[in-house]
């Protein structure tokens, strides 16, 4: 029972961890997280906070502070924050420009307000941030897309 059983146990743990990490990657980053019966209403919502450099800076402060978004999405918005490492599926990667072209501000707001079933995304309004702060954060999230 000595070294061989320990070795087999370590190999099994490494294989399980590897499979978990591969499975943690988001399968379809363009898939909406708003339920089908609510998506039209979410898409119709317009961001009341102007997308100005000042508001983007405020959004960054909220993303990295009060909103705690960086914990899962990472400071660079890549979905690689310290808490995001254990989530399956992984948090959204806001540097994915295809995601930003596909999803409307109202959809992002809906997820911030209601959370997203089957993911680690919890409702942040009103427990952590206000509706206005959520819209401000969305302006900052949009700034992660640098082209494409």
Language model feature labels by segment:
Residues 1-44, 148:
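N-terminal export/targeting leaders of redox proteins
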Residues 91-102:
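Short microdomains enriched in Cys/His and/or Lys/Arg
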Residues 40-43, 86-93:
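Short glycine/proline- and charge-enriched loop/turn segments
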Residues 32-64:
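Electrostatic cytochrome c docking/interface patches
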Residues 23-31, 92, 111-144:
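Axial heme c-ligation environment in periplasmic c-type cytochrome domains
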Residues 71, 123-124, 148:
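Surface-exposed patches in mature extracellular/periplasmic domains of secreted proteins
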Residues 54-78, 84:
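Sequence/structural segment immediately N-terminal to covalent heme-attachment motifs in c-type
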Residues 57-61, 70, 92, 106, ...:
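Solvent-exposed, polar/charged alpha-helical surfaces in well-ordered, non-transmembrane soluble domains
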């Amino acid at each position: 029972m000595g070294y061989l059983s320990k070795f087999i146990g370590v190999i099994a743990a490494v294989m399980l961890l590897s499979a978990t990490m591969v499975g943690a990657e988001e399968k379809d980053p363009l898939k909406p997280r708003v339920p089908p019966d609510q998506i039209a209403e979410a898409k119709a919502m317009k961001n009341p906070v102007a997308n100005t450099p000042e508001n983007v800076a405020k959004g960054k402060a909220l993303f990295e502070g009060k909103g705690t978004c960086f914990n899962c999405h990472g400071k660079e918005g890549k979905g690689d924050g310290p808490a995001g490492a254990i989530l399956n599926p992984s948090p959204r990667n806001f540097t994915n420009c295809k995601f930003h072209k596909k999803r409307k501000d109202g959809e992002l707001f809906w997820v911030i307000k209601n959370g997203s079933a089957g993911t680690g995304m919890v409702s942040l309004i009103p427990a952590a941030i206000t509706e206005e702060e959520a819209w401000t954060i969305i302006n900052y999230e949009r700034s992660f897309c640098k082209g494409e």
